[in-house]
Regions:
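Active-site acidic/histidine proton-transfer and metal-coordination neighborhood
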Residues: 1-77, 81, 206, 210
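Hydrophobic faces of well-ordered beta-strands that scaffold small-molecule active sites
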Residues: 7-9, 47-49, 80-84, 109-113, ...
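Extended recognition/assembly regions associated with phosphoester-bond processing machinery
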Residues: 25-28, 32, 36-46, 60-61, ...
């Protein structure tokens, strides 16, 4: 119904104590199960495996990092690729380099966009580290610029909206994702490559920051207008009264919010 031709699998398999799980056998079971799914996948579909460092298990996770994820995708076959959730990494992980590696070897399937401070926080995209989001898109735009073959990563949002209107957060996140993309398009690729070849670290970094500091909001607003959208989408959403309307139509919850009812 929605035209999807990709299946993402994230499993919480892992352990909380040393010795609780045999690492090798656990991974063998994972590969076997994914292999069964892969065999039934239509020829024009892709299978994405997703890594996550920890949680709900805190000692080990079967698919804990991009290296294991790459092994999975390589073992299963050409229809298998890696999905990168920005929040599924340790703080300060160089996610943009992971993206570059997966692009280089044809195994970047797509993204779950969000943001984080400590771990898998599932905060709104661009709310904590918008520069990192820009650097990720810099790698995507660079791949397009270099003409990487069969490069069609999927873009998804995976967030948890606990203190905001979920629709408003999704609108804001979509805007931040588009902003990072627009800024990445402004990078002077020829100049950047020259500085990289000359090992001019300062000017190479400045080339990226110059694009990042550019105010692209007027471009984004005009793009929304040309496609029939609102120039100020959150203001338009609030003025529509949609939230109040659906709140009246929503059935009353019979739960008191406790764990036991």
């Amino acid at each position: 119904a929605i035209g999807s031709k990709a299946l993402t699998v994230w499993l919480s398999d892992g352990s909380n104590f040393p010795g609780q799980q045999n690492f090798t056998r656990a991974f063998e079971r994972y590969l076997h199960s994914m292999g069964e799914i892969y065999k039934t996948l239509p020829d024009d579909w892709r299978l994405f495996s997703e890594h996550k460092m920890y949680e709900p298990a805190f000692y080990s996770t079967v698919v804990q990092d991009w290296g294991t994820n790459y092994l999975i995708a390589s073992t299963l076959g050409p229809k298998a690729q890696c999905l990168v959730d920005l929040g599924h990494h340790a703080p300060n992980t160089n996610i943009e380099m992971i993206v570059a590696r997966l692009i280089q070897f044809g195994k970047l399937g797509g993204f779950h966009f969000n943001d984080s401070k400590y771990g898998d926080d599932d905060l709104d995209a661009g709310s904590i580290d918008p520069y990192r989001l820009f650097l990720v898109f810099n790698e995507l735009v660079d791949a397009d610029y270099r003409g990487v073959k069969d490069f069609h990563p999927e873009h998804m949002i995976d967030q948890s909206h606990n203190v905001t209107d979920p629709i408003e957060s999704l609108i804001s996140s979509a805007n931040e994702i588009r902003r990072a993309y627009a800024q990445a398009l402004l990078v002077d690729r020829e100049a950047l490559e020259t500085y990289q070849q000359e090992n001019d670290a300062l000017m190479a970094s400045d080339t990226l920051k110059r694009a990042y500091r550019t105010d692209v909001e007027p471009i984004l607003a005009e793009a929304r207008r040309r496609t029939g959208g609102a120039i100020e989408p959150i203001a338009a959403y609030r003025a529509s009264g949609y939230r109040e309307k659906v709140a009246k139509e929503r059935p009353e919850s019979k739960s008191d919010g406790g764990a036991f009812n």
